[in-house]
């Protein structure tokens, strides 16, 4: 199971769906409210049978024993009998995009008898060699759909431009736009 929060969870959801179609047992626990961090809700959502967890953070805390979400998850399992193996990972450093291939690498790492801890995905770490290896590029989305995600800064025209684009696509093509 991967524990993460933020926009990366959408990529992980696509990856989970892709792997589930192949019969691979993987999961995602998406954190929506980080503080206060709820032990009750975490354990209600986490399967009791989980054996290995990768906690992904999009931050680097120099000098700390681990990144914030990772440390919180580790603390929840501290002293618990039959606690799962918990490893830390970083993604999206240097504003790098996160891809389904990278999430597959995380799940493959978890499948190892001794998963790599404190790994990175999305950058090639040729200094400390913490990067997970990537395999071939995959398409984890729906083959029959086209998806776009636009970000705007507010009052920059993004919303209006996208509404117009969606209207044109819906009116002038045989595609369903929403």
Model-derived regions, located:
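Anionic-ligand anchoring segments at beta-strand to alpha-helix junctions in alpha/beta enzyme folds, i.e.
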Residues: 3-35, 144-178
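Glycine-rich, anion-gripping cofactor-binding loops and their flanking helix/strand elements
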Residues: 9, 13, 21, 28-65, ...
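Short acidic, glycine/serine/threonine-rich loops at helix termini
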Residues: 13-15, 39-41, 64-68, 97-102, ...
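Peripheral docking tails and interdomain loops at the edges
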Residues: 52-141
């Amino acid at each position: 199971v991967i524990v993460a929060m933020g926009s990366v969870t959408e990529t992980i959801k696509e990856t989970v769906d892709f792997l589930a179609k192949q019969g691979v047992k993987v999961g995602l626990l998406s954190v929506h409210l980080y503080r206060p961090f709820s032990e009750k809700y975490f354990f209600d959502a986490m399967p009791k049978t989980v054996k290995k967890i990768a906690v992904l953070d999009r931050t680097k805390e120099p000098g700390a024993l681990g990144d914030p979400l990772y440390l919180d998850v580790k603390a929840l399992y501290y002293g618990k009998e039959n606690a799962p193996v918990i490893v830390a990972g970083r993604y999206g450093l240097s504003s790098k995009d996160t891809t389904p291939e990278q999430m597959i690498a995380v799940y493959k790492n978890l499948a190892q008898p001794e998963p790599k801890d404190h790994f990175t995905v999305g950058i090639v770490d040729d200094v400390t060699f913490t990067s997970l290896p990537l395999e071939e590029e995959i398409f984890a989305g729906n083959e029959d759909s086209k998806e776009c995600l636009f970000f705007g800064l507010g009052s920059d025209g993004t919303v209006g431009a996208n509404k117009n684009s969606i209207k044109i696509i819906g009116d002038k093509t045989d595609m369903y736009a929403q």
